[in-house]
Amino acid sequence: MKKAALLNSDISSVIARLGHTDSLVIGDAGLPIPETTTRIDLALTHNVPTFLQVVNVVTSEMQVEAAILAEEMIEKNPAVHDALLDQLKRLEQHQGNSIALHYVSHEEFKTQSGKSRAIIRSGECSPYANVILCAGVTF
C-alpha cells in the first residue's frame, strides 16, 4: 500500500505521466468534461470531497509551475479563491519556486480544460471552484 497522501491510482498514474507544461484540471461537480478528455470522478455527494481537499492532495505529488483560474472566481467565490491562493503560496514555499497565476474567462477556462491530460471532478458545489494546474519540473 502507498504511504504517501495520494492513494487514488488513476490520479497517481496521470501525475506520473505528466511532462513539463502538461496540465491537470481539478474541477467542481458542475464543470463540463469533454468526452475526449480523461475523467477521474471523485464526487460522492455534495461537497465530498471538497475542491480544496483534492487540490491539497494532488499538489502533494505534483510539481506545479502555473495555475489557471476563471476570473469569475474572484467575485463569485471569494472564500474558495482566497483559500486556493493560500494553498498555492504554501506550495511555492514547499517546492522552492514561484507559481505563475493566470486568469481567463470561464468560457476560455472550459476550452483550455479540454486540452488537459485529465479532469478530476470533486464533489464541490460552489461556483467556479476549478483550477488548471500546469506541470513544472523538479530540477
From Swiss-Prot:
Q: What is this protein called?
A: D-ribose pyranase
- Which organism does this record belong to? Pectobacterium atrosepticum (strain SCRI 1043 / ATCC BAA-672)
Residue positions binding substrate: 28, 106, 128-130
| Record SUPFAM superfamilies | RbsD-like
The subcellular localization recorded is:
Cytoplasm
Q: Which EC number(s) does UniProt give?
A: 5.4.99.62
Molecular-function annotations in GO = D-ribose pyranase activity; intramolecular lyase activity; monosaccharide binding
Catalytic residues at 20
- What Gene3D superfamilies does the record tag this protein with? RbsD-like domain
> Which family does the similarity line name?
Belongs to the RbsD / FucU family. RbsD subfamily.
| GO process terms (BP) | D-ribose catabolic process
